Amino acid sequence: MAKCTLTSLILLLIVLVLIQESHIVEGRPLKSSRISNVSKKFAAGNSNLSSKLTTEDHSLDAFRPTNPGNSPGIGH
């Protein structure tokens, strides 16, 4: 009787784990047609655009502390 109960308990735990894993895997289906339309529109766009990358000087000397009272605060 104890062996049957232990087997039932292990089986129940396995079933619960599998059910939980199936809930994690569920998700909404992706619509790939919208993505392909966007890529076609982007490819058909103006090909004469030039890409200009700018580099900004981010050194320790560029740091300016904020005066008291002008800080945006936490979360802003």
From Swiss-Prot:
GO terms for molecular function: hormone activity. The keyword Signal applies. Glycans are attached at N37, N48. Residues 49-76 are annotated as: Disordered. It comes from the Eukaryota. Residues 1-27 form the signal peptide. One of its GO terms (biological process) is regulation of root development. Belongs to the C-terminally encoded plant signaling peptide (CEP) family. Extracellular signaling peptide that may regulate primary root growth rate and systemic nitrogen (N)-demand signaling. Mediates up-regulation of genes involved in N uptake and assimilation pathways. This is Precursor of CEP7. The lineage of its organism: Eukaryota, Viridiplantae, Streptophyta, Embryophyta, Tracheophyta.
